[in-house]
Amino acid sequence: MPTQIQNNFRVRKTFAKIAKIIDIPNLINIQKQSYEKFLQADIAADKREDLGLQGVFKSVFPIRDFNETSSLEFVSYHLERPKYDVDECHQRGMTYSAPIKVVVRLVVWDKDEETGAQSIRDVKEQEVYFGEIPLMTQNGTFIINGTERVVVSQLHRSPGAFFDHDKGKSHSSGKLLYNARIIPYRGSWIDFEFDHKDLLYVRIDRRRKLPATVLIRALGAVPDTAKKNPLEFKGSTEEILNYYYATETIYLHSAEEFEKSVELELLPGQRATRDIKAKTGELIVKKNRKFTRAAIKKLEAAKMKTLPIDADELFTKVSAYDVVEETNGVVLLECNEEVTQEKVDELLKHGIKEFKVLFIDNLNVGPYLRETLMLDKLETPEQSIMEIYRRLRPGDPPTPETAINLFTNLFFNPERYDLSKVGRLKLNFKFGLEEPLDGQILTKRDILEVIRYLIDLKNGKGTIDDIDHLGNRRVRAVGELLENQYRIGLVRMERAIKERMSLQEIETLMPHDLINAKPVTAVIKEFFGSSQLSQFMDQTNPLSEVTHKRRLSALGPGGLTRERAGFEVRDVHPTHYGRICPIETPEGPNIGLIASLSTYARVNEFGFVETPYRKVEAGVVTNDVAFYSALEEEKHTIAQANAETDKKGKFANALVSSRRGGEFVQARAEDVDLMDVSPKQLVSVAASLIPFLENDDANRALMGSNMQRQAVPLLRTAAPLVGTGIESIVARDSGVTCVARRDGIVESVDAGRIVVKADVPASLSDVTSEVDIYNLLKYQRSNQNTCLNQKPIISKGDRVMKGDVIADGPATETGELALGQNVVVAFMPWQGYNFEDSILISERILKDDVFTSIHIEEFECIARDTKLGKEEITRDIPNVGEEALKDLDESGIIRIGAEVKPGDVLVGKITPKGETQLSPEEKLLRAIFGEKAGDVRDSSLRVPPGVVGTVINAKVFSRKGVEKDERAKQIESMEEAKLLKDQNDEIKVLQDSAFGRIRGLVRTKEVQGKLVDDKGKILLKKGDILDDELLSTVPYKYWGEISVGDPLDSRLRDILRNLEETKEAVKLAFGEKIARIKKGDELPPGVIKMVKVYVAIKRKLAVGDKMAGRHGNKGVVSRILPEEDMPYLEDGRPVDIVLNPLGVPSRMNIGQILETHLGWAAKGTGEALQRYVEANWSSDAIKERLKVIYSDPAFGEFLDKLDDEEIKQLCLRSKRGIHVATPVFDGAQETEIHALLDEGQLPRSGQMVLFDGRTGEPFDQNVTVGVMYMLKLHHLVDEKIHARSIGPYSLVTQQPLGGKAQFGGQRLGEMEVWAMEAYGAAYTLQEFLTVKSDDVVGRTRMYEAIVKGDNVLESGLPESFNVLLKELQSLALDVELLESAPPERQRSFGGDFLGGGDGEERKTGTEA
């Protein structure tokens, strides 16, 4: 029976108090789902939704020609199988992509000249190749030109309407100027803004501003595009004013006596112009008093219909309509005209007793729009549209048709303007509209409502939008980014198609003649190759991969730029809670612009980030979970995940700490309607891997989560003793481990692959799917040159379940993330070697390879076809001794396993040299002794400085039609053998399974007819009863002829037929792969052969390497001390690392101390358990002890099922310490750490007596000792240090280049020169500034002097001086250099003055 305690079994004691409600969603879903939605590859063409690729095709097609006589329509598309699989693309430097084929239909119309009716003349349908589209791998990455890349999701401003003000900065008075902006997904922006005179203006696409009423009036000239209740709006002044202002009726009794109608909703805040009494004589409001709510109620009760009004008040009012004299139609009072005494008299004269005025009280309602109308001199919609045309196209003479056309195209044409579903959703939400979500263009009501809201803001109603609210920012994931690129490509292609349709004779053309997919593929290539959002994957370790795929960037096309982004955008916002991690963001210029999704967050169909909450009903917490976006969450009161509840889920306290509308409040239990799912939903994956995160300062937690991503995978991995319980999830979702696809039993295991026989119901006659072969990744190079290697962690015969980890990858151990090592640390100063965060380390760590990592470098050698002839890869290299070639094979490529150092030849290569003119003597010698190897030069690939390692692999790629060399053939045959082994294994398992099934069917059955082999030997007699023994005598090839009677016979034939078909399919698939290996490779033009050599470098921990814990506690190794000199414990065990205690208090990352104590307790408990097992082995007693330690009822039940051997195995696993999990914000309390220290028989203080390794004396005070998880970071001293010998110089300044990559020198800057001057080191300084730097002449003289043995320095003129001269001359300054005479000559002139007496010495030269 397989044991329960397999190698991939790991149990953690968890300190969590809060039960798990839902699992963390798959960590790379954001990438995979978005791309699946974009491609819709597995959905039938007729069932695809109009989004992603389908949506793009649908929106660009049909393409009509300019005369509308033909159109090209889109029917469907499908993806074919990719040419190369993922591994082949990696090796060959190809892009992992699939060809896309599109079915298009070309329809040619006949147009009736008289009626204009169209009839179809011809329809041609054809499948057209549409280029390749990159596919996403299983792990959410793309392989572009052989390297893995990730497309980062972009956070951008959501489409919709936004309201804001200028914070009083625009005008000197400090007045708030409000503005509104309608931002579409694509199309023209509309900005509305008030100026300091309170007039309302509009800008279209940030052009010159127009009065807003011009745009409002222009709307009257176009039909409304609303799908639901369209608005009848003709754009007249009356319509405009009555849309925005309420009206009152004025009753004229005489020239001095007026009344107005009572409009109850308009009264609050107004003052009474005189005492107002009811009919009963009761005083309702005194003169000059405001109408209060009580007064309005009294008015209502008294049923008063009118109120008296003073002349002063009446003569500020504005007419709402034209008042017309009925008999002859003369306008007595125009709309928007102020009422005056003259007008009143005129009205009374014509017998008009009542008219309507606008309600403008300058308190709650301002006259802004009315005053803007006064400014606007245009009177009809047509004039307004012409004015807009003039602003947008200055210099173009407008005609009514072109003007209306342009205006319609701006906002009401779906091809030019797209609000997107999100934009429509936001507008509906903001203004309470009911327009359907597919109404993705603006309607009249949208524009009018935006202006209404803006005027309300100005009047003091409503609030401005918070641009950083996550309801106003949305995520564009891969699918959407690619969709936009594809649209750009198709639009470019559309132009070309239109031109072709009109140029050529359409009847003779087929669709493929019109379509050229080059522009589309070019756009896609450019996006993946050079877009800011398509990034080289950070593959340092599994965590960095996962984080990279979950990253959100506010940068990139259509986003912000580093320089322009202010503090608000970068800051943490209340809506980030549970959606975006407040901790994980880079330090430096990108801080806050690049963020990470929180653990439970997901992106909804509109691109808004959602987070899950548990529903609370009547004060009882349920287990129903729903996802809410930032906007949906606004109205709810949300309790924290750690709010206390009783067994029934009721809140234990009357007041619960909650969040409402972004504020923290103490809410009543019955008011709470949602509750957090988990305490870790607040933070990202990297931050949730930090134990005791709650005890760390936020700045250090930020460094901690960033530095975990830089941890180098080590040769020996160890999962942290103190984890947070999320390690296994990260390892599983990152894709670096190998995960079982279905339940089954392990058939065979070796270092390179695992074969699992899956559980398939015995009833099936189909044998196709019974075997799963997992090929493991062996010693591959990652993007960051770390080593990717998988090793199996299960044994033959083990039972595996779907989702189990069956092989560990880099930086994982037993299926858990293992970025570093558990080491014993002591916090104490030691001889100043841990000053300023330095780290003192024991030599044991080097001896045991604790922090050793493997790095793989790839070197490439290319043989090209040059003008002078072909380059050749060969062992025969001119002027190279046999010693240097000892490791090359006959093809000139280094053998695998060779140890190489800088300067060694990896691949021998010779390049033809240009023909040189030979002297007669050389010609003679050549004629006598034959051709000498003088016409080629050595251009071999050599190991660069700083690389010492072992060759682990070599690959040879040859052009088609080029003879393969021995090495290439050898590699080919090895790969072929590997594939054949896979094929044979698969066939063997299939056969075993099929015959096993048949055996089960025919066992105990009676043979119906005798079975004879080819030679006539009887194998089975009629009437034999079949059993395993008898069946084993019959060779497999005769099993198909066994007859046991129907219906079993036909079932038997079915199984065998199915087996044969499956075998054929398997052979075919492997045959294709083998053929691909044998075929020549696709190489860039001009390349004949390419060799890649991989060198593995072992890097032990060295002085200068950077190390860190998980709490932002980083340092550099300062000294590696012999084990015997390290401080040691009472039992003689030395500690591994000594850290500086002064690094803790000021940094406030106390989590590291708690981790150290808990780690010590976990180690001590494991050791105590070991001692207990050795002292008194009794499985029952140990079970009880384990139940006490783990204190988990479910684990207790599991223990009861184990036998003695399994219990022993379980105890053996904990000899280095038991593994514990302390989840973030829900971790171990101090009392629990004390309890575990007691279990491990350790002092509760966590401090021990330490002895000095050099003297054996105890230190004065007890020292904090414990186990900390330390990481070795990617900043390795071996990769940073370098020394320049002969290297390149800059062209302009002639100074050596800088940096290791350029093999540069050390710069001696201004300050260093001052230091040399201060020491008075004149000669050294002269050397530094001339011959060692940029003095070209001096450099050559120096070389000559050294060769001749003169030790004299003759410096020339530094090139930088020449540069200075040229710069001065470029400023038109004539600079002349004077050469001073040598000292002796000066004396001979009697030393009168420098430069000689007769002016002969004054000559201009370039040498000073």
Swiss-Prot record:
Record-listed E.C. numbers: 2.7.7.6
GO molecular function, one term: DNA-directed RNA polymerase activity
Gene that this polypeptide is encoded by: rpoB
Function: DNA-dependent RNA polymerase catalyzes the transcription of DNA into RNA using the four ribonucleoside triphosphates as substrates.
Catalysed reaction equations from the record: RNA(n) + a ribonucleoside 5'-triphosphate = RNA(n+1) + diphosphate
InterPro entries in the record: DNA-dir_RNA_pol_bsu_ext_1_sf (IPR042107), DNA-dir_RNA_pol_bsu_external_1 (IPR019462), DNA-dir_RNA_pol_su2 (IPR015712), DNA-dir_RNAP_su2_dom (IPR007120), DNA-dir_RNAP_su2_hyb_sf (IPR037033), RNA_pol_bsu_bac (IPR010243), RNA_pol_bsu_CS (IPR007121), RNA_pol_bsu_protrusion (IPR007644)
Keyword Transferase in annotation: yes
Cited Pfam families: RNA_pol_Rpb2_1 (PF04563), RNA_pol_Rpb2_2 (PF04561), RNA_pol_Rpb2_3 (PF04565), RNA_pol_Rpb2_45 (PF10385), RNA_pol_Rpb2_6 (PF00562), RNA_pol_Rpb2_7 (PF04560)
Protein name: DNA-directed RNA polymerase subunit beta
BP term (GO), one: DNA-templated transcription
SUPFAM superfamilies: beta and beta-prime subunits of DNA dependent RNA-polymerase (SSF64484)
A GO cellular component annotation in the UniProt record: DNA-directed RNA polymerase complex
Keywords carried by this UniProt record: DNA-directed RNA polymerase, Nucleotidyltransferase, Transcription, Transferase
